[in-house]
């Protein structure tokens, strides 16, 4: 049974009815909108946000949260033109429910996706429970638009039985290296892994599979950006059920490292009720040096490791080109251009 969306009182919402439904339920009502600038920026329980920009539109692809044992089965997209007002897709674009869904190999645990564009196609990587192997595996779905429709491949592409393995094959993050024009996928739980993506983006080049070094206290949630000749890797430390879940940071001379640990750049502020700040992604406003970080935290109030909400804050660099520790806020960010 799907849990009812919980809408924090700080939000002003329109057309946002609470619903209780089975995982197969398809919400055909018109898209949801968040009108107010206060956080969270996405209504209800959403975690592991992957923020991206395509053209003039920003997208967040999150884990649909609020289920025991992170048992959500659906992926939705959210979109915005100003990073403050977000509209959700009226229907899930992927449902991980075996033959009742549209991802043949997966039965639930729709977790931590990432998306990237290549040659006009959009590749959406995600993890799910794979009953064939009785573990989490990573798959890919393809579309001609960031809003879909997406077609999932019939089998998972990373099975966690490769030459190098991690605790779980989860938390993928796709990255285009602007220096080499190579496409990479990062993933892992307990130990980080990366590999170059194949030319068709549907598998990894197994000869490039490696475990990057220098990611002190790595737990999960890798994310890579590039700025002014430096590769910036962020990742999550501790357990998502812990209020001390936080974001670690390392830099390197290439997309594969070696990386130098730079410390923690995002952590809780208990004085504000902000706890378990982790599993981030980062986006640059095209044509500027303005950067933003999306991440989840325990829902306020009374959230926990399966009741998480997504917010956005500004991200800055110092004079040496390193990320400055992020100040988590309850206000989130002003609309772009305001």
Which role fits each region the language model picked out?
Residues 22-338:
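Carbohydrate-active catalytic/glycan-binding domains of CAZyme proteins
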Residues 1-34:
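Fungal secretory targeting signals
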